[in-house]
Amino acid sequence: MAHYFVGDIQGCFAELQKLLAKVDFNPSRDELWAVGDLVARGPDSLATLRFFRSLGDSAKTVLGNHDLHLMALHGKLKRTKPSDNLTEILESPDISASIDWLRQQPLMRELPEHQLIMSHAGVPPLWSLEVLREEAALVSCALKQDDYLEALISQMYSDSAEQWDPSAIGIERLRYCINALTRMRYLYVDGRLDFDCKQPPENCTNPQLKPWFEFASPLRQSHTLVFGHWAALMGNVGDSKLKALDTGCCWGEHLTLWHLEKDQKITQKKLKKS
């Protein structure tokens, strides 16, 4: 059995299929883990989502910011933009089933036998494994409720929840977890989340900002952390226990697959339009 981890697919279904063919992926024996953002921007979000649903227990994904955004669009809480490239999936006959499937997906996953954690954007440096589990579970619970659109999705868009406050309750607590696990790149030196800078560290001009993974963290010492979201890194983080897998396929770069057991990365360049 092999565990394959793939970066942000964002509708780049043809590239995903070529990657899986390169490693002879077989869902009857292997598992495909995705760092989230299965949809948006790329040409085949519908095919990507249907493929993951078809894999059953052989597919493990976490929610990314674009996956949550799809829920908001389906619930008529946001207006779709041409850059989302989500009209096909929103008009598909199985959109409700797709949304229900996404609602069952967590914000973090673990592979305990390999001391590995996967989330879309990373893990807040102050969080222990216990806190990470608890906070992610609160969001998952809210997503599974009948009133998830009104109680969570309609209120999740906020930059106000930028600082971890263990005494926070209700939507503010859920907002911070969503912001941290699906949107985080840089933190201020006081630990606040920054939502503006998307540049790689060498191009960041604000001396008050540091990448989240450069802060001291108990989980950074004990676990391999697999994440996506930050395409500008292009996988370059300088630490073998950090696996940054978003390599900008939807922006014209490439899609990256990491074979855990071999500690090997396989890439597929963005295909040219025919």
UniProtKB/Swiss-Prot annotation:
The protein's name: Bis(5'-nucleosyl)-tetraphosphatase, symmetrical
Function: Hydrolyzes diadenosine 5',5'''-P1,P4-tetraphosphate to yield ADP.
Membership in a protein family: Belongs to the Ap4A hydrolase family.
Cell division is among the record's keywords: no
Keyword Hydrolase belongs to the record: yes
Organism, scientific name: Shewanella baltica (strain OS223)
Catalytic activity: P(1),P(4)-bis(5'-adenosyl) tetraphosphate + H2O = 2 ADP + 2 H(+)
CDD domains associated with the record: MPP_ApaH (cd07422)
GO BP: RNA decapping
Protein's gene: apaH
Enzyme Commission number(s) from the entry: 3.6.1.41
GO molecular function, one term: phosphatase activity
Keywords from the named record: Hydrolase
